[in-house]
Design a protein with these regions (language model features):
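Beta-strand-rich domains and repeat architectures in extracellular enzymes and scaffolds
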Residues: 46-76
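Structural motif
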Residues: 74-88, 125-137, 168-171, 175-192, ...
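Loop/turn-rich, solvent-exposed surfaces of beta-rich toroidal or solenoidal domains
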Residues: 264-318
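Blade-level signature of beta-propeller repeat domains, shared across WD40, Kelch, NHL, RCC1
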Residues: 328-378
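Entry beta-strands of beta-propeller and related beta-repeat scaffolds
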Residues: 65-70, 119-123, 164-173, 222-228, ...
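Short, small-residue-biased leader/transition segments that mark boundaries at the very start
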Residues: 2-6, 11-12
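Beta-propeller fold detector
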Residues: 38-49, 89-104, 139-148, 193-205, ...
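Repeated scaffold domains used in trafficking and secretory/extracellular systems
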Residues: 50-62, 103-118, 143-166, 203-220, ...
Length: 378
């Protein structure tokens, strides 16, 4: 016989044996999350001020080991905050304090070119590749420059650390220039050496040329895919959309576009992430009726995009407030990205936190995460 009762806020279930003497008692407690699981939460205020102060210079935020590093163009000052040990469900709290560290970046370093591979950072300075194990001390990496060529772009890297990598592709994808022409190149890291493969097809003029933003993710089949966006060259015909370029090996890149009215609009300094099983792009718009940051754009396939008007919002757009008379107010922080045309940089850390750093006009650091990525599922 089974009977039910309530004990406080818990449901009590009693299971009695046929002799009516032996019984087991079970108590069930249902816990309700007060947060909307699929909502991106940034908090009401930025988590910290931009430690570089009021700057119009380009910046780059990256993760390296247990640290998040913030670089500023034309500066040897690097700011660092530590990611504490633990898992995303441990209610970790960090990012309020940033420590100043002095670096020795090479002359002409382009901080927007920084990528991470195999627990090292790589950047370009005057078309030469440099690497660093800590982001502070940098050394030229002549091996990564093919003979008779210069490196014009570091695109991204493929690594076992990115997820299931059945093809065992580990290395750095770049663009090199030879005899006045640009080609895709891939430096594959083996146990003891680099093997560099340079393609024969010229890089399309539509491929992004600067301020690249890339992400690498594992597919359901266990292979890695890389995606990249960025600023394109001036004067291109029909350049009215932000097109994602994708690659399975770093050697060949294809544009993910189809004739459609549902393209991602043309954005300045676009950033792309694969997050919570979807793709997101943000950047600055340049429409007559919409300047600066407006919203995230999302796609499940990289081909058809739509603007996000709820749940996954830009930092500083606060929850709507219902006033008397049925009027709904849509408040936002003075440090919101909405409508701003500032320089910015963005990264996702291992705890699924999205970090967005704004330059002059915002000068703040925001940290956000989709709520359910911090839930403990039992």
């Amino acid at each position: 016989e089974i009977s039910e009762c309530l004990v406080g806020s818990e449901m009590c279930i009693r299971d009695r044996a046929p002799d009516m003497q032996t019984q087991n008692e079970y108590r069930v407690s249902v816990r309700m999350h007060r947060m909307v699981p699929d909502s991106l939460s940034w908090g009401k205020e930025p988590i910290a001020a931009n430690p570089a102060g009021i700057t119009e210079q380009k910046q780059k935020i990256v993760t390296l080991g247990d640290n998040i590093l913030l670089f500023t163009q034309n500066s040897d000052k690097v700011y660092s905050t530590t990611i504490p040990a633990g898992s995303p469900t441990d209610r970790l709290n960090y990012g309020q304090n940033w420590e100043l560290k002095n670096a020795t970046l090479p002359e002409g370093a382009d901080v927007t070119s920084i990528i991470r591979f195999d627990e090292k950072l790589y950047l370009l300075a005057n078309n030469k590749v440099y690497n660093s194990a800590d982001g502070l001390m940098w050394a030229e990496d002549a091996v990564l420059t093919p003979s008779g060529a210069t490196v014009s772009n570091l695109i991204t890297s493929f690594s076992d650390n990115d997820g299931s990598n059945h093809k065992k592709i580990n290395g750095i994808a770049s663009i090199v220039e030879k005899n006045g022409q640009k080609y895709f190149s891939f430096a594959e890291k083996t146990e003891n050496e680099w093997n560099i493969t340079t393609g024969e097809e010229i890089v399309p003029t539509e491929f992004p040329v600067n301020n690249l933003s890339a992400d690498v993710y594992a597919t359901e089949s266990g292979t890695l895919n890389a995606i990249v966006v960025g600023n394109t060259a001036d004067g291109l015909d029909n350049d009215t959309a932000t097109v994602v370029w994708a690659s399975e090996d770093g050697k060949a890149w294809i544009p993910m576009e189809i004739p459609s009215n549902n393209n991602c609009p043309k954005l300045v300094d676009p950033s792309i992430i694969h997050y919570n099983d979807a793709f997101y792009i943000c950047g600055k718009e340049n429409k007559d009726d919409a300047k600066g940051f407006q919203k995230f754009y999302t796609s499940p396939t990289l081909l058809v995009w739509k603007g996000v008007d709820r749940m996954f919002m830009l930092p500083g757009i606060l929850p709507p407030v219902k006033l008397e008379g049925g009027v709904t107010q849509y408040p936002y922080s003075e440090y919101s990205f909405k409508g701003k045309e500032v320089n910015y940089t963005m990264v996702v850390d291992r705890n699924h936190y999205i970090w967005m750093v704004g330059g002059k006009g915002i000068d703040k650091i925001w940290r956000g995460r989709v709520n359910k990525l911090g839930f403990l599922i039992q």
